[in-house]
């Protein structure tokens, strides 16, 4: 179905038909057709309110609602194929409604502009997809919690500057990402408070002379409140930008996590194994096992960042109130929504099918310079000022590297040559599991602390 050769919704004021190339250029139906459910949902609420306010008759409202419900099914089943000459999805639906029920279809738009119509559609879309992204994040949080529990007693290297820093519980590592993604989910929940405000009834930007009841429209659509200023209701896209920012934050965290997966699964690190079901090979090099899913997630973060910058740039400098520039908000919104949800979903599945190489990690962490901090803190407990302890430990590390003797195997006499305070107790500090277990501070990497973090996290899932 197409509205080819039909008058555009706004065309009656003009003496010449809209240039076809201009129409093709300005048409958005290929993008905003994704809003057809929300558009019909908003229209049904609007016409219900119109009938209750006696602006249209109940019989007219029933005919309009029945027609809209049929059109929704036609669009869902692909029986209506929007054409660029339809201009936008609102035009597609209204023209099809007119074909079905005649002139009464024209009453649907009473007291409504495409400005508040599309603002309503967008908020309904955001509300639905915020829920979808939160659900995907909840699944990822569940996987992270499972990993943290399973590997709570496994020791890995903690890194700073991509240099081995200190031994930590692997569970602590997974709980770090759990905490990040939990904040991402919480941010989306907070955004819902601002999204869940209905702009329907603001009309073009100045309101209407008809006795509309915006509160009733909002109630029918499940909104928690209504707009306070009709100009603001149709002319800002800050909630959309905030959502894109939240998506960018999610993708930033995923990208960092993906980088760890890529590095740790490499031959050089060899800490982590990705399931064959989530890896690819090379068309030339038979030995390759590539972390392509993680790489794609890392790459898609750039797209989502770009969408955020695109929206900020589109809105920069626009005079109040509505401007056609805002039509360009749909592609960034739809792309970031789909990318974020799909990335979180596939990353969760991939992560669930990874395993840490515990034997290799145990060997690597047992004789590594990452225990140097334990030496410094041992000296602090011997009442040596930390700066002096740091300097002494640095010299011990240099000697260890030059002599080729691992820290746990340095003779006591050699330790004493650096500081007389050393005694046999130093060797108890130079074990990775003892180092992790000895941590005493809140939120630390000790096994006990990680278990506390896990138990607290279970309450948030």
Swiss-Prot record:
What GO terms are given for molecular function?
Answer: argininosuccinate lyase activity
Localization per record: Cytoplasm
- NCBIfam families in alphabetical order: argH
Q: Could you say which enzyme class this protein belongs to? A: lyase
Q: What is this protein called?
A: Argininosuccinate lyase
In terms of PROSITE patterns, this protein maps to: FUMARATE_LYASES (PS00163)
Reactions catalysed: 2-(N(omega)-L-arginino)succinate = fumarate + L-arginine
Task: Please give the chief subcellular localization of this protein.
Answer: cytoplasm
GO cellular component, as recorded: cytosol
Q: Which keywords label this protein? A: Amino-acid biosynthesis, Arginine biosynthesis, Cytoplasm, Lyase
GO BP annotation list? arginine biosynthetic process via ornithine; L-arginine biosynthetic process
- Which species is this record about? Chlorobium chlorochromatii (strain CaD3)
Return the similarity comment.
Belongs to the lyase 1 family. Argininosuccinate lyase subfamily.
What InterPro entries does this protein map onto? Arg_succ_lyase_C (IPR029419), Argininosuccinate_lyase (IPR009049), Fumarase/histidase_N (IPR024083), Fumarate_lyase_CS (IPR020557), Fumarate_lyase_fam (IPR000362), Fumarate_lyase_N (IPR022761), L-Aspartase-like (IPR008948)
| Superkingdom, natural source | Bacteria
Q: What is its EC number?
A: 4.3.2.1
Q: Does the keyword Lyase apply?
A: yes
- In this UniProt entry, which cysteines form S-S bonds? none
CDD domains, per the entry = Argininosuccinate_lyase (cd01359)
Give the pathway annotation: Amino-acid biosynthesis; L-arginine biosynthesis; L-arginine from L-ornithine and carbamoyl phosphate: step 3/3
């Amino acid at each position: 179905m197409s509205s080819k050769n039909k008058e555009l919704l706004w065309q009656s004021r003009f003496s010449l038909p809209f240039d076809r190339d201009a129409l093709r250029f300005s048409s958005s139906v290929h993008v905003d057709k994704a809003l057809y459910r929300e558009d019909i949902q908003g229209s049904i609420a609007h016409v219900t309110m119109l009938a209750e306010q006696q602006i249209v008759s109940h019989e007219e409202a029933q005919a309009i609602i029945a027609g809209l419900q049929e059109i929704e099914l036609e669009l869902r089943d692909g029986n209506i194929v929007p054409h660029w000459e339809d201009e936008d999805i609102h035009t597609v639906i209204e023209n099809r409604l007119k074909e079905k029920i005649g002139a009464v279809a024209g009453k649907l738009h009473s007291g409504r502009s495409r400005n508040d119509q599309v603002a309503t559609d967008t908020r309904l879309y955001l509300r639905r997809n915020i829920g979808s992204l939160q659900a995907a994040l909840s699944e990822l949080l569940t996987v992270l919690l499972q990993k943290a529990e399973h590997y709570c007693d496994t020791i890995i290297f903690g890194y700073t500057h991509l240099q081995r820093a200190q031994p930590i519980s692997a569970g602590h590592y997974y709980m770090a990402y759990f905490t990040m993604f939990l904040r991402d989910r919480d941010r989306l929940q907070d955004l819902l408070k601002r999204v869940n405000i209905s702009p329907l009834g603001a009309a073009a930007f100045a309101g209407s002379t008809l006795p509309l009841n915006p509160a009733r429209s909002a109630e029918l659509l499940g909104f928690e409140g209504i707009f306070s200023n009709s100009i603001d209701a149709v002319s800002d896209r800050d909630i959309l930008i905030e959502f894109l920012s939240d998506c960018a934050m999610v993708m930033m965290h995923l990208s960092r996590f993906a980088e760890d997966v890529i590095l740790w699964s490499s031959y050089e690190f060899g800490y982590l194994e990705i399931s064959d079901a989530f890896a690819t090979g090379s068309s030339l090099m038979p030995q390759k096992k590539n972390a392509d899913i993680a790489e794609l997630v890392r790459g898609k973060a750039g797209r989502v960042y770009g969408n955020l910058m695109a929206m900020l740039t589109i809105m920069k400098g626009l005079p109040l109130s509505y401007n056609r520039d805002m039509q360009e908000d749909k592609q960034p919104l739809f792309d970031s929504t789909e990318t974020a949800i799909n990335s979180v979903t596939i990353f969760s599945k991939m992560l669930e099918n990874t395993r840490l190489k515990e034997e290799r990690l145990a060997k690597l962490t047992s004789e590594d310079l990452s225990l140097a901090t334990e030496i410094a803190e041992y000296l602090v407990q011997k009442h040596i000022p930390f700066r002096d302890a740091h300097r002494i430990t640095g010299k011990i590390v240099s000697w260890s590297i030059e002599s080729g003797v691992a820290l746990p195997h340095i003779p006591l006499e050699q330790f004493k040559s650096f500081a007389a305070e050393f005694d046999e107790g130093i060797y108890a500090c130079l074990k990775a599991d003892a180092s992790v277990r000895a941590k005493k501070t809140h939120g630390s990497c000790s096994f006990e602390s990680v278990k506390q973090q896990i138990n607290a996290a279970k309450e948030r899932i």
